[in-house]
Amino acid sequence: MKTRTKNLISLVLLSSCLTAMVGCNTQGKGKVDKDNLVFDKNGIVLDNFEGLGVEWGTYEDPDKLSSGSWERSLKIMDRLNPQVTRCMLNYDWFITNFDDKFDSDKSNDTWEYNFSNKLMNNTIDVLRYCDDHNIDVAFGCWNVPGSLGKDEYNMFTEVTSDARWATMTADILEYLIKFQGIKCIKYFVNSNEPNYSGVEGKSKNYNNTFEVWAKGVKNVRKALDDRGFNDIKIIGGDTTGFEGTIEYFNGISKNDELKEAVGDYGFHVYCPNMIIDTGDLAVRIRDIYNQVKKNDKDLGVKRIPHIWEAGLYDGKNAETDSNAYIANYSYGLRMADYTLQCAIAGVNSIVYWDFDDGMHFMYNADGTMTSKGWGMFSSLSTDSAMKQRLRPWYHSSVLLTNLMRKGSKIIDNPANDPEVDNTFRSMAVVDENNTYAGVVAINRGMLPVTKTFRVAEEFLSNATTPNKIYVYIYNEADLNIGEDGFVKENQVLDLSLKDEIEISVPQNSMVILSSKEL
């Protein structure tokens, strides 16, 4: 007969009830126990997670920012504490004095660069922050230079396979790395979403194919190596959508030369709610992973899977490239669920789209600009005070980015199988030195559920606070925001994660139990 010591805990000012229970119950063998969850070495999916981050690119018009917004943005970034980011720009911003010699021979074209402008200054500000805060950067260009309807550089036919693209890439990276001393650039993005071709006159990418993109990757690889940038990896794809991603990943995995030219399998996922809500996202990611693994045994070793743009598809307005649900609590819960499912499926890092509404714009036919509303807040002076507030999904992201650090172990459990339960998911996160651990529990159901959690004692062998559990609850009623405007714990328990902890997880909520303050 099992014996337990029960501790009832009152959560002041919370609408939900949480209890803690210490005991010796263990997960049974055979049939999956979906109520008593143990995280041990058998559940390790990743043993060297690379961290979470957010898209933080060059601000396309810094003059539109509100007074003091840059300083505020840095404080917001400080609290988010990402370990990876993606920084994109346009080469058009810097190319000047282009001369094609009035002939069809591209090899004798000449051009210069003007790096003394506000766009390069802002780019360097972002990259220096990343240097100072040990943030790995995927740096790249949205697409080949040239404006729609003009193609003044004659690059739309060959796209990134044009040899001049590789030269421009190496030139700009050389300026940043050798002349500006930037050290954080670890990856190069060989154009954004190359599989999204579009149509001539409305897209620079209309003539792109996998073969064209692959040729461009090889050109860029040689150009970077010739400049001594052998350690900068090229993202293997940066594709969007499941179907297009599978095409590119299979193409890479079956081509030995191309496999050696790229440094990861990188893609974008804007996921429909239904796929996340039912737990099917993890299933789909694993399916892609297993397909690639058949051809590339180094998947997960030499070439790591990354998601470089993570967002939700439902609520997207194609005309404004914004999401109508971005300020809802449900957006934050789904993005947390998205993150958990990708992590337990083996994705090694995830970059959220995106940080600030003030970064990117839609350029309209009448010459006006419309900001893309996907951010965690807005720094635009023209936006209302409401839009400039931190959105709920910023706070849920803060909790995850501060728990899921570089080098962490991600630990799954059998109860996450959607056939067992498609409304509840959980994982454990343990840092590389076993100094802290955390459990993330997400209830997508319509009713509260009671679960018990235990993290194997071996994962807390060097715990700095072995008998403390910081409890964080994310939902509209219980999210706890401190006087500084940032999320804080709901309660601190004098317990250990190596003991059995029983909690009631409210409906449509995330609960995090962490042995360190997040």
Protein language model regions, located:
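Aromatic/acidic polysaccharide-binding cleft in carbohydrate-active enzymes
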Residues: 307, 311-426
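Bacterial N-terminal signal peptides that target proteins for export
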Residues: 2-12
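C-terminal motif of bacterial Sec signal peptides marking the signal peptidase cleavage site
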Residues: 20-23
